[in-house]
Amino acid sequence: MTDYTPQQIVARGARADAEAAADAIDNHPGLEGATYSILEEDEDKGLWRIDAFPTTDEEDAGLLEVLAGYPLKVVRETLADADWLAMALSGLPPVRAGRFFVYGMHDRGRLPASTVNLRIEAGAAFGTGHHGTTVGCLMAYDKLIKARKFKKVLDVGAGTGLLAIAAARTGSRIAVGTDIDRPSVRISKENAKVNRANAKFVHASGLGHRLVTDNAPYDLVFANILARPLISLAQDIKTALVPGGTVILSGLLRTQERMVKAAYVSRGFKVVNRIHRDAWAALVLQRP
């Protein structure tokens, strides 16, 4: 196997084309773990962009193949042989979401006294708190815990572990996180130690891992992944929750909200809150 030279692939175009390409990436059999984002770049021009960061030659070729099928302008550049993502994010400002203050080491000297301060360093795992989906989850969770506490919490697609760590730091007795990406699991474990949070993380696809099933059922499930996995996991998430339990769904675009909601409402869930941030949506639903 040859070493892969890190690349960034950027595709720009109309919203419908960018969203269709993103759906195609999600459904491509060779791109299950591909890292990409989709966002609105210029509202006046109706311009959207996809940023993709392949890690292998196969991912690189697969992404280019998918993007070539849509009327998007695709450019690419070679990234420096360095921890380029950490370098790009190291200067990010802290994020405030309700009672939560998410920061990096560069902001350690200006922490508010009245917040739950969570140190999450920039890196390859998703979930520094800056993305609209993660902020939406934190905002929804902050509102929920004003009324009640959640003793047992599951975080599906944990990334940096931020959401499970936030739960552990605000009174959850059990906080379990899963991710399909092994480096993310390692990073989330490190973040739990740094934040002195009693949260456990495992490498798992779906909800079948023994650590997940042994601690079920849960009072609260976070699922900050993508729209199609959210739909396919609807029944498993229902099974993992106690009757009356809560799920916070994120990782979906506003345009995908209706179909994701339908998968849960058809199983008896009730929508109790919605949060929109940028192009992203978060749904809070209660199990019957």
Swiss-Prot record:
It catalyses: L-lysyl-[protein] + 3 S-adenosyl-L-methionine = N(6),N(6),N(6)-trimethyl-L-lysyl-[protein] + 3 S-adenosyl-L-homocysteine + 3 H(+). The keyword Transferase applies. Gene3D superfamilies: Vaccinia Virus protein VP39 (3.40.50.150). InterPro entries: Ribosomal_L11_MeTrfase_PrmA (IPR050078), Ribosomal_PrmA_MeTrfase (IPR004498), SAM-dependent_MTases_sf (IPR029063). GO terms for molecular function: protein-lysine N-methyltransferase activity. Pfam families: PrmA (PF06325). The keyword Cytoplasm applies. GO terms for cellular component: cytoplasm. It is found in: Cytoplasm. GO terms for biological process: methylation. Its main location: cytoplasm. Keywords: Cytoplasm, Methyltransferase, S-adenosyl-L-methionine, Transferase. Transmembrane segments: none annotated. S-adenosyl-L-methionine binds at T134, G157, D179, N224. Its EC number is 2.1.1.-. Belongs to the methyltransferase superfamily. PrmA family. Methylates ribosomal protein L11. This is Ribosomal protein L11 methyltransferase.
